[in-house]
Amino acid sequence: HDMKLILTLFTCLFVTGCAYAQNFSDYFTNKTLRIDYLFTGNADKQSICLDELSELPVWAGRRHHLSELPLEGNGQIVMRDVASGKVIYTTSFSSLFQEWLETDEAKEVTKGFENTYLLPYPIKPAEVEITLRNNKREVSANLKHVVKPDDILIHKKGLTHITPHKYLLKSGNEEQCIDVAILAEGYTTSEMETFYKDAAIACEALFSHEPFQSMKNRFNIVAVASPSADSGVSAPKQGAWKHTAFGSHFDTFYSDRYLTTSRVKAINDALAGIPYEHIIILANTEQYGGGGIYNAFTLTTAHHPNFRPVVVHEFGHSFGGLADEYFYDEDVMNGLYPLNIEPWEQNITTRINFASKWEDMLTKATPVPTPVANKAKYPIGVYEGGGYSAKGIYRPAFDCRMRTNEYPTFCP
């Protein structure tokens, strides 16, 4: 089901709509409007603050199906033309802030998290509405603001001071292809040759998997040599703090392997002037870990033996919006998905609205739920355990890339 979902996303990106669909050039110019927000709050109350607007030299995102939402995500952005009220662009995302809200710390303290989104640059004034949803899929925060394209305080970025970079795969221009940037984290200036080699391995790992393998000619991959003062990344549990480009660290939410960064603006600043839609950050460390957040970033360790499968797994989160299919009895995120709500992620189900998921891919004889003993007979089934919970959440295959590193492929 992972594969089917990613193929659907490709269709959204490349197939032009009906004759009545809006043309990109009706409302937009070939530039990017970058919006930096702060998501703030605690377990009880959340809000969204506007931070800064920037203009980037080109638009690398989709030019078709502009007003359609490929996936719901945990948050949505809708851009409307002020004059007509028409929806001219929409996108969705998930955020580290929303994951943090499920932790015990969020019951005690109010925090703020940086979040950055890229939108096509409007020709005329546009209203941008951003909405966060909780895990019951209810609106938890909302902000509307008008962007005037000729506002002198919109910061023009990416014209100078562009980070050194090399293309590992160039299949076409940014208009025709999905642009993925691989960023260096914890590599000093003298370690950049190692970074370029690591980025090439990540690239090769990604395209050894379907459906990416068949779609390779639709991708551009650029390795961006963002330098760090220190080598390696921070590991708070070991008391090791490093001065790096994006301040990445293990032990996010006190979970050993959860490697993330909260410096989202610094990440996007390092990419200004380079066309990008998706971000993979490689951390120069042998310690095991990673993280992937839908339409935000993938972060993974480059020198652990499982680097290849982990980068593919995490890209499944950030590119495909896929959920984790693994579960532990004591998982810190256990309870993230309420069992009486159908999750928006396409590869897990609570069976509240299973018809919206992979029900149509099951054979008539498939038992629901599917016993583990029958896993060989039913490659696609409804296997209990997923989304960090052993009970009440189901996954489409006994094993796949979103569950274990050992499994060679995504589910069908």
What is each residue range found by the language model?
Residues 1-24:
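Bacterial Sec-dependent N-terminal signal peptides
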Residues 27-153:
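Beta-strand-enriched, solvent-exposed domains that form extended recognition/catalytic surfaces
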Residues 152-210, 223-233:
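Fold-level signature of zinc-dependent metallopeptidase catalytic domains
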Residues 186-189, 227-231, 285-289, 305-307, ...:
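Solvent-exposed loop/turn segments at secondary-structure junctions
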Residues 194, 291-314:
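Short pre-active-site segment immediately N-terminal to the catalytic Zn-binding motif
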Residues 218-294:
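Active-site-proximal segments of metallohydrolase catalytic domains
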Residues 315-331:
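Catalytic Zn2+-binding segment of zinc metalloproteases
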